[in-house]
Amino acid sequence: DFMRVNVLQHAPNQGPGSIQAWCHARDNEMFVYHPGNFGILPTVDETDLLVVLGSPNSPNDDLDWVKNERVLIRKMLDQHKPILGICFGSQQIAKTLGYKVLDAPAKEVGWAPVYLQDQTITGIPDKLTALHWHEQMSEIPTEAKLLFSSDLVKNQGFLLGDNVIGLQFHFEPQIDNVREIAINDGAYALENNDLHQTPTEIINHGVPEKNKDVMFTLLDFIAK
């Protein structure tokens, strides 16, 4: 039975990456929405799985589309439907649940290890190298399990029940996506970056092969 996977994309250089590959591999149908550009969101009834990607905006921004996304997230939560939030998307889930989005203790832009904090989802390595592109984080919902931490920022991911995952970092970019992120938003890496990596270094690092596998594992877990 195929699923309709609705992806909310907010930055032209931050697309679904390997999430698209997962949709194809599982015979699911992916629909990409750009709510900040076109003001259109799917309904909960036409959403089997919701993916909320990163954004240069913050959930704290007083914008209609930002608030409307949280209305959709709330309906998804109420119906126990699967949600994957990445970066801004993870923060949107937490804010929907009433938690704060605040400045992280460090601005992380580039590649850095994340460490698995919970064994509920099997088949994930204890340590992975992920792409970070953020300076804010959310509080971890008390009803959720802390899923990942980095050396500089504890709140890197959470698992809520068996159907909602929030990640503060990026497992989804493949190498083409990393180039697209870094060449278009490279200035962000050069300002007060606690990982001290340049756009060129970020691109040349390459993508660890495991990251796509873990992305598939996480999506399979919430989609089951």
Annotate each PLM feature.
Residues L8-H10, P35, F88, F169:
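Cofactor-binding loop segments of dinucleotide-utilizing enzymes, especially the Rossmann-like FAD-
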Residues F2-N6:
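Extreme N-terminal starter segment of soluble prokaryotic enzymes
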Residues M76-K100:
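Catalytic nucleophile loop
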Residues E29-N37, P113, A130, L147-S150:
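Short gly/ser/thr-rich secondary-structure transition/capping motifs
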Residues D61-W65, P105, P125:
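Short, solvent-exposed loop/turn segments at secondary-structure boundaries
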Residues H24-L84:
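Flexible gly/pro-rich beta->alpha loop and the following alpha-helix that scaffold active-site loops
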Residues V7, L102, L116-K224:
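Amide-donor transfer/coupling interface in amidating biosynthetic enzymes
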